[in-house]
Amino acid sequence: MSNIVVCVQNEDQKVTAKQTIDAIYKAGFKNVFVQYYHRETKGLDELEQIDYCRKLGLNIIFCHLGYKNSRDINSIWLEGETGEKVIDGFIEDFKMLKERQIELVVMHLVSGKEPPIHNEIGLNRIKRLVKHAKEIGIKIALENTRQHIYVEYILENIKDKNLGLCFDSGHYHCFSKDKFNYSLFKNRIFAIHLHDNDKISDLHLLPFDGTI
């Protein structure tokens, strides 16, 4: 049976991550995912959030890695040290998360409306990332975002059981207009982000509150 997983949202200015985790626990949910964005948070930092979830007996199904601000994911497609440092940062994340028994991470390949064109520079960097993840026993799920061509490009060119897809239903609806290459991805789906929208904006509505 599939696990229903609730996000530990850690960027709310009025509600702390601890309050969010407590609310999830009191509501009776058993599974969560934690945003591991290296973001300054009120109260518990991101690693402490993982520890607190475990203290309450919550299962952490995966961690979602950061992709913007100090970690500009678009740079992985460009020549230069910045892209290499981004990959190095992810590798360090893997080590820290593996120490806390996290076995699945979700990540984006691009950010924004006009990312660089997909190319072998980015492909080779993701190959390096997958190699390190496999060595320590972590699986990577790539999320379909505004331009799903990047996920298709990487998964077509890296045939590895440790690399798969986090299918985002909302992005599929409003960005891809319900068009997706299921034949390529159907056996490589590691996680699903389930939310709804009006097919125009990425609203993150509850299922059935939109037009999917």
Predicted segment positions?
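N-terminal pre-domain/capping segments
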Residues: 1-88, 98, 160
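Acidic-and-aromatic substrate-binding clefts and catalytic sites of carbohydrate-active enzymes
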Residues: 8-17, 34-48, 70-71, 112-117, ...
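Residue-level detection of beta-strand scaffold positions
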Residues: 21, 57-58, 94, 138, ...
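Acidic/histidine-rich catalytic cores of soluble enzymes
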Residues: 32, 63, 127-211
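Short secondary-structure boundary segments
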Residues: 36, 109, 196
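Charged helix-capping and loop-helix junction motifs
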Residues: 44-50, 83, 87-88, 119-127, ...
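Active-site acidic/histidine proton-transfer and metal-coordination neighborhood
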Residues: 72-164
